[in-house]
């Protein structure tokens, strides 16, 4: 979102989370904003699709995203194509095939499709822009706010397996409450290189601690958050 818009994802429904078990694991992030708030490109690219999903399916059903824009990013991942999907728009300001720069206007926040309130739903898709399952965590792909960075990591059991739905708290000296849950199931895909199962973006530059309590054991790891960088931690139960 441009300056003045909200860039913080809804806390209960970050990528891979379920809103306290009420919803399916999230395929992207939701940025709550007033209807009509400008939506801009997260990076340079070419508009792959601009329209609605009444006749073409981009999720498990039609008319799910409403008005949407899919941007094929100039950036690639290991030579694989990347796409940013912007959904539930109230207006679309670009056309298919149009080249756009980072920060260029794409449309406006709305609540079209299955949205219950105005917000931007943002996804990152890899390889196939129409495949609902080929998503990755958007917080790894859009730039943090100025002076902020990203914390990603793995929470593992004693055998080194991902622990689903685990609360991770991020304790920082500014006193802000930051928390996230690990991805809820194996269909929520991590980055193939990073192999994370949680991400929390837009943390101001400072030293923080990631902590999670499992089986009565409090696990803690320090993390130095640096502007425009991704810090990484591993929280694993010790072997018996």
Language model: regions and residue ranges:
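Surface-exposed, glycine-biased beta-strand/turn segments
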Residues: 1-68, 74-76, 102, 111, ...
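Short alpha-helix capping/helix-loop boundary micro-motifs
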Residues: 32-33, 86, 90-94
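A residue-level detector for short acidic-glycine micro-motifs
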Residues: 49, 88-91, 108-111, 157, ...
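A generic structural motif
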Residues: 51, 75, 90-93, 128, ...
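Conserved, short, structured surface segments that act as functional micro-motifs
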Residues: 59-71, 98-148
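Short amphipathic beta-strand segments in non-cytosolic proteins
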Residues: 167-191
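Short Pro-Gly-centered beta-turn/loop motif in secreted/extracellular proteins
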Residues: 188-209, 214-216, 225-227
């Amino acid at each position: 979102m441009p300056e003045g818009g909200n860039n913080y994802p809804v806390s209960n429904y970050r990528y891979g989370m379920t809103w306290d078990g009420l919803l399916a694991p999230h395929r992207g992030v939701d940025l709550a904003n007033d209807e009509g708030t400008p939506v801009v490109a997260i990076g340079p690219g070419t508009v792959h699709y601009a329209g609605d999903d009444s006749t073409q399916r981009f999720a498990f059903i039609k008319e799910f995203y409403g008005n949407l824009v899919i941007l094929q990013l100039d950036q690639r991942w290991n030579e694989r194509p990347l796409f940013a999907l912007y959904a539930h728009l109230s207006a679309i300001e670009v056309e298919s095939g149009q080249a756009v720069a980072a920060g260029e206007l794409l449309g406006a926040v709305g609540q079209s499709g299955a949205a219950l309130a105005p917000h931007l739903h943002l996804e990152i898709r890899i390889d196939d822009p129409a495949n609902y399952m080929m998503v990755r965590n958007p917080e790894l792909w859009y730039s943090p706010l100025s002076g902020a960075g990203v914390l990603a990591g793995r929470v593992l059991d004693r055998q080194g397996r991902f622990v689903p739905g685990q609360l991770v708290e991020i304790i920082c000296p500014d006193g802000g409450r930051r928390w996230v849950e690990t991805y809820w199931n194996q269909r929520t895909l991590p980055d193939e290189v990073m192999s994370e199962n949680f991400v929390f973006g837009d943390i101001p530059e400072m030293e923080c601690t990631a902590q999670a309590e499992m089986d009565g054991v409090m696990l803690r790891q320090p993390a130095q958050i640096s502007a425009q960088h991704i810090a990484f931690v591993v929280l694993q139960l010790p072997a018996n």
